[in-house]
From Swiss-Prot:
It catalyses: glyoxylate + acetyl-CoA + H2O = (S)-malate + CoA + H(+). Keywords: Glyoxylate bypass, Glyoxysome, Peroxisome, Transferase, Tricarboxylic acid cycle. Residues 65-86 are annotated as: Disordered. Belongs to the malate synthase family. Pathway: Carbohydrate metabolism; glyoxylate cycle; (S)-malate from isocitrate: step 2/2. NCBIfam families: malate_syn_A. The keyword Transferase applies. It comes from Emericella nidulans (strain FGSC A4 / ATCC 38163 / CBS 112.46 / NRRL 194 / M139) (Aspergillus nidulans). GO terms for cellular component: cytoplasm; glyoxysome; peroxisomal matrix; peroxisome. Its main location: other. This is Malate synthase, glyoxysomal. Residues 65-78 have a biased composition (Basic and acidic residues). It is an enzyme of class 2 (transferase).
């Protein structure tokens, strides 16, 4: 029996495998996935249990703080992260989006520096979405992704170097139920990373780039250590020098914010910086402190990047990254053009401009946009205020952020019925799309992904849990939350196309907005609705 066949013992693919998919789900690639699972899944499960234990401590009132046991790492000025890899020196504007073929072509044709191809929050992880995404990136890297849809042709431009590709894998908490090893589903992280790396790492290096990743939803430096171990094994396995991979970590949980230096340290030979994951960070803030009434936040529109706890997080991230010689990436501009209202569009674009100006002046090295039309605005601002490829020389020695700063909930604003209805509308609309296999939904001219839906349902839970009173004088309780939910779900279902899933979304949402049950992640809660493991396909 060959080594590959030995690894494939007790490996099963429980999703359909098309002829196209066979070039991705090769025996060799599946054997590599099996090795990743068998080597790292026990550690992953232990780290996920650690999250549960930490939440229990926070519920008891033990709030996060900088770790005393890693103070020596923070205090040691001598170490640095890895130098920027080819194609990652200048990252002033990054476009993000799912990995469907049309998005891949449009993103790579945009006037941006990098494209974050997303298997995570802007993709619903149906088996077809995940496998087709791998096929599309495989083809894009080899410049064979052109296709025709109806009368429209989608072709990669050839007049300049294309943006650097960065793949975002799913977070450590998500499973891929269509691929099992020894009877267990593989981690979504290892599945997404493993297939992309195995097929494309050498091809990317040959083309002057490398296997680059965005790493989401981490909650501690130990989770970064696990990624680093995965990277080392993967590079050794295919005979690639260690330190070729790069990973940019999204700091989008409040616990990770206290461990930024340690996260860079754990990944130091593979680190390409940190990113401000705005909406997930707010979600994490509400989620982690949901049992504490003094952490109740006002309407989501009042929780801007300039409120104390968000401002502190941004400043600390920039200072930390530049101290260690890696990129400090800014957050998402989620606006999409308003084509039928010039005045409203101008106002929205001015908002984008102001946000990007705040980022570049703060010292960020680049920023995110969700729509190609915003790239020119972001580029214009960064080109004007950042003439160099990045701002690592901006050290922010003036910044001294304390634990109290990161936990400062002094947020001016109010809780309104309009805010409640907006949260219901966003949560229901996003969940309904996700249940149809769409992970990126335009709502009120904003491109919403899982993070914004998470903020919406977490706020509703928090307000009901603590019985807040709206500015109109209405007490938010279970009955009130469920009444408004029913009104919104009925209205959206009536207005939506035939066969929509708003009532199903409403049934799931009802369990999340009363201040009682609270699912760790909406995506985990809904996953069984869009996963359809069947009989095993032949390997």
């Amino acid at each position: 029996m060959s080594q590959v066949d030995a690894q494939l013992k007790d490996v099963a693919i429980l999703g359909s495998v098309s002829n196209e998919a066979r070039k991705i789900l090769t025996k060799e690639a599946c054997a590599f996935l099996a090795i990743l699972h068998r080597t790292f899944n026990p550690t992953r499960k232990a780290l996920l249990q650690r999250r549960v234990d930490r939440q229990a401590e926070i519920d008891k009132g033990h709030l996060p703080d900088f770790l005393p046991e890693t103070k020596h790492i923070r205090d040691d000025p001598s170490w640095k992260g890895a130098p920027p890899a080819p194609g990652l020196v200048d990252r002033r504007v990054e476009i993000t989006g799912p990995t469907d073929r049309k998005m891949v072509v449009n993103a790579l044709n945009s006037d941006v520096w990098t494209y974050m191809a997303d298997f995570e929050d802007s993709s619903a992880p149906t088996w077809d979405n995940m496998i087709n995404g791998q096929i599309n990136l495989y083809d894009a890297i080899r410049r064979q992704v052109d296709f025709k849809q109806g009368q429209k042709e989608y072709k990669l431009r050839t007049d300049r170097t294309l943006p650097t590709l960065i793949a975002r894998a799913r977070g450590w908490h998500l499973d891929e139920k269509h691929f099992t090893v020894d009877g267990e589903p593989i981690s979504g992280s290892l599945f997404d990373f493993g297939l992309y790396f195995f097929h494309n790492a050498k091809e990317l290096v040959a083309r002057g780039f490398g296997p680059y990743f965005y790493l989401p939803k981490m909650e501690s430096h130990l989770e970064a250590r696990l990624w680093n171990d995965v990277f080392n094994l993967a590079q050794d396995y295919i005979g690639m020098p260690r330190g070729t991979i790069r990973g940019t970590v999204l700091i989008e949980t409040i616990t990770a914010a206290f461990e930024m230096e340690e996260i860079i340290y754990e990944l130091r030979d593979h680190s390409s910086g940190l990113n401000c994951g705005r909406w997930d960070y707010i979600f994490s803030f509400i989620k982690k402190f949901r049992q504490h009434p003094n952490f109740v936040l006002p309407d989501r529109s009042d929780v801007t990047m300039t409120v104390p706890f968000m401002d502190a997080y941004v400043k600390l991230l920039i200072k930390t990254c530049h101290k260690r010689g890696v990129h400090a990436m800014g957050g998402m501009a989620a606006q999409i053009p308003i084509k039928d209202n010039a005045e409203a569009n101008d106002k929205a674009m001015e908002g984008v401009r102001a946000d990007k100006l705040r980022e570049v002046r703060a010292g960020h090295d680049g920023t995110w946009v969700a729509h190609p039309a915003l790239a020119s605005i972001a580029s214009e601002v960064f080109n004007k205020y950042m003439p160099t490829p990045n701002q690592m020389h901006v050290r922010r020695e003036d910044v001294n952020i304390t634990a109290n700063d990161l936990l400062n909930t002094n947020v001016p604003g109010k809780i309104t019925e309009d805010g409640i209805r907006k949260n219901l509308n966003i949560g229901l609309s996003y969940m309904e799309g996700w249940l149809r296999g769409v992970g990126c939904i335009p709502i009120n001219y904003l491109m919403e992904d899982a993070a914004t839906a998470e903020v919406s349902r977490s706020q509703l839970w928090q307000w009901a849990r603590h019985g807040v009173t709206t500015s109109e004088g209405k007490k938010v309780d279970k009955a009130y939350a469920l009444r408004l939910l029913k009104e919104q779900a009925d209205a959206l279902a009536a207005k939506g196309p035939k066969g929509n899933k708003f009532q199903l979304a409403g049934r799931y949402f009802a369990g999340q907005v009363t201040g009682e049950d609270y699912a760790d992640f909406l995506t985990s809660l809904l996953y069984n609705e869009i996963s359809s493991p069947g009989t095993a396909s032949k390997l």
